[in-house]
Amino acid sequence: MFHLYLLLVFETRYTCLMKCSISTCSYRWLRRREWFCLIYSGCCRKILVIEGLQRSDVAFLFTRRTIMHYVPFRGLFCASCVGYFSIRCCSRCEHFCTKTPTKSFGTEAWS
């Protein structure tokens, strides 16, 4: 039973990442352990940032796990690609995860 649980958790995370890899956004993939799902949008991305925010704002929003409480979400956003918040804009996020993490920003703990 325990092994089955581990398999289900792995499969959920893998499916989530694969769905994002075929999304309309195009940017280089980094280490998988740095990816997570936003709680409110359910969208898999590495460091999601809204255009115009400062680095400190992004860090604050993600540590609080309430980015949608602070930033209006209309389906348009920018995703960080390589380096320290270098921004590439995406048109939409059309693929979603089935689960959300228990913690945000660089964890693999799934609820």
Curated annotation (Swiss-Prot):
Any single GO CC term annotated in Swiss-Prot or TrEMBL for this entry: host cell nucleus
Keywords: Host nucleus, Secreted, Signal, Virulence
Disulfide cross-links: none
Residue positions of motif RxLR: 28-31
Signal peptide region: 1-17
Subcellular location: Secreted; Host nucleus
Superkingdom in the source lineage: Eukaryota
Secreted is among the record's keywords: yes
Role this protein plays: Secreted effector that acts as an elicitor that induces cell death in host plant cells.
Domain comment quoted from the record: Has the canonical translocation RxLR motif, but lacks the canonical EER motif, which characterizes most oomycete effectors identified so far.
Family: Belongs to the RxLR effector family.
Identification of the protein by name: Secreted RxLR effector protein 82
UniProt organism field: Plasmopara viticola (Downy mildew of grapevine)
